[in-house]
UniProtKB/Swiss-Prot annotation:
Its main location: cytoplasm. This is Acetyl-coenzyme A carboxylase carboxyl transferase subunit alpha. The gene is accA. PANTHER family: ACETYL-COENZYME A CARBOXYLASE CARBOXYL TRANSFERASE SUBUNIT ALPHA (PTHR42853), ACETYL-COENZYME A CARBOXYLASE CARBOXYL TRANSFERASE SUBUNIT ALPHA, CHLOROPLASTIC (PTHR42853:SF3). Component of the acetyl coenzyme A carboxylase (ACC) complex. First, biotin carboxylase catalyzes the carboxylation of biotin on its carrier protein (BCCP) and then the CO(2) group is transferred by the carboxyltransferase to acetyl-CoA to form malonyl-CoA. It is found in: Cytoplasm. It comes from Paramagnetospirillum magneticum (strain ATCC 700264 / AMB-1). Signal peptide: none annotated. GO terms for molecular function: acetyl-CoA carboxylase activity; ATP binding; carboxyl- or carbamoyltransferase activity. Keywords: ATP-binding, Cytoplasm, Fatty acid biosynthesis, Fatty acid metabolism, Lipid biosynthesis, Lipid metabolism, Nucleotide-binding, Transferase. Acetyl-CoA carboxylase is a heterohexamer composed of biotin carboxyl carrier protein (AccB), biotin carboxylase (AccC) and two subunits each of ACCase subunit alpha (AccA) and ACCase subunit beta (AccD). PROSITE patterns: COA_CT_CTER (PS50989). Belongs to the AccA family.
Amino acid sequence: MHILEFEKPIAELEGKIEELRHLSDGGDVNIADEVSKLQAKVDKLLRSTYAKLTPWQKTQVARHPERPHTLAYISTLIEDFTPLAGDRAFAEDEAIIGGLGRFRGRSVMIIGHEKGHDTETRLKHNFGMAKPEGYRKAKRLMEMADHFQVPIITLVDTAGAYPGVDAEARGQAEAIARSIETCLNVRVPLVSVIIGEGGSGGAIALATGNTVLMLEHAIYSVISPEGCASILWRSAENAKDAAEQLRLTAQDLHKLSIIDSVVPEPMGGAHRNPDLMMQTLSMALDSALRDLSGLDGGVLRARRREKFLEMGRAGLS
């Protein structure tokens, strides 16, 4: 497992546990009591460490390479998933995954950023940084869901939209704006979940939902801490300071009413117990969809638009 800097004391204890278990395999020494005591220390240290994470530490957890990504959630939560590809204008962008499936018996359209889990898949999915064709694909799938009256689930996990010259030449800003516009206009329930990183316009292009959920240790911000530090302090080395100022944690954003609910993560983060994370998110999604089911399409659309317009009015009165 990839160990974060602040997790090293925990990892050392876990290493001792593994050593003792290895010795115990020989059957010569009964060390069950010692293992039990060390495990209790690990659990206590995990709780105390993760209960007081700084914004910068939460940023590291949100970026953890073993954190579950969109494809993992789809394979666990969605039955009969049928992937849909291409923007019908230029190309397929595998930074955004989307398709139809069934969630707890109901048909849904699910769309999300995919970062990949190793070198090969990270390159394939462009580290979750979508190009214009990715956002145009998302727009197409949302319009399809609207046409067939199918609820939409979006999973957000990106450092930001791809900033390359080729993406700009193909209208990156326009594609993001059209995706946001489509989110605001559909007349079906739309539930968005920030599962890892929620970076800038590349994130909000899929996060303009009726209900916005956010995992406990995810982050959501107008800019990355490194990008903010490079602008304000002229050095990315001040990323820790920038993270403190950006109010990017789920807890801060819930207080500011930017998100609707914080979804608890397993002790030690989603990467330590992906199965439990899937179960918890499944229940949260089911509850959110139930709350929205039965509402008229016009009401869903009006509430969603008003929700985000109200954010823009903050501090004006």
